[in-house]
């Protein structure tokens, strides 16, 4: 499964000089949690909601540009990357999104931890369900061996008693 099959292709971006208050307002009005920061058609960083919340607490001015608070050197994937690789990058780097780049290193999409969860949830939901309750199946499977062991135990205990 490739990232290109599941990524969001229409990506809202901001520039490094976008004031953090504007980025915060835009994030909340659109319901996003991350923005790629793009300059000259290349991703130069990622800003997350938590970065903006920390900035709001630590900076006195809402005009501080996001390049002062963003995470530089973003972790990215290509559109041909395997989905499991993208998921591993998210987990290993403790991040919530990955900008998706084409072969020219230009932004073509984004994949988020929410996208990955939706894919996993869809796979789990698509699994066939048992036609019989699991308890009955398990009980039936162990019934005969347990009876055998119980009979042997009874025989041994009666031999010892005699």
Q: Which residues does each PLM region occupy?
A:
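Histidine- and aromatic-rich ligand-binding microenvironments
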Residues: 19, 47, 51-52, 64-69, ...
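A glycine-centered beta-loop-beta connector
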Residues: 27, 35-50, 90, 98-114
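Cytosolic regulatory modules rich in charged/polar residues
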Residues: 103-108, 113-162
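The conserved cystathionine-beta-synthase
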Residues: 13-31, 38, 77-94, 101, ...
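Nucleotide phosphate-binding site architecture
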Residues: 4, 12, 21, 53-54, ...
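A short, polar/charged loop-to-alpha-helix boundary motif
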Residues: 53-66, 117-129
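Bateman (tandem CBS) regulatory domains
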Residues: 1-11, 62-74
């Amino acid at each position: 499964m490739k990232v290109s099959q599941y990524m969001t292709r229409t990506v809202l971006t901001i520039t490094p000089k976008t004031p953090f208050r504007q980025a915060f307002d835009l994030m909340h009005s659109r319901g996003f949690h991350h923005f790629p920061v793009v300059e000259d058609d290349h991703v130069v960083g990622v800003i997350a909601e938590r970065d903006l919340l920390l900035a709001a607490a630590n900076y006195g001015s809402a005009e501080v540009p996001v390049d002062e608070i963003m995470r530089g050197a973003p972790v990215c994937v290509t559109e041909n990357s395997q989905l499991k690789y993208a998921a591993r990058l998210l987990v290993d780097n403790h991040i919530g999104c990955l900008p998706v780049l084409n072969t020219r290193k230009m932004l073509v999409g984004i994949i988020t931890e929410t996208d990955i969860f939706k894919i996993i949830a869809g796979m789990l939901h698509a699994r066939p369900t048992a036609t019989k309750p699991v308890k009955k199946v398990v009980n039936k499977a162990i019934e005969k061996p347990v009876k055998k062991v119980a009979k042997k135990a009874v025989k041994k205990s009666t031999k010892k008693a005699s």
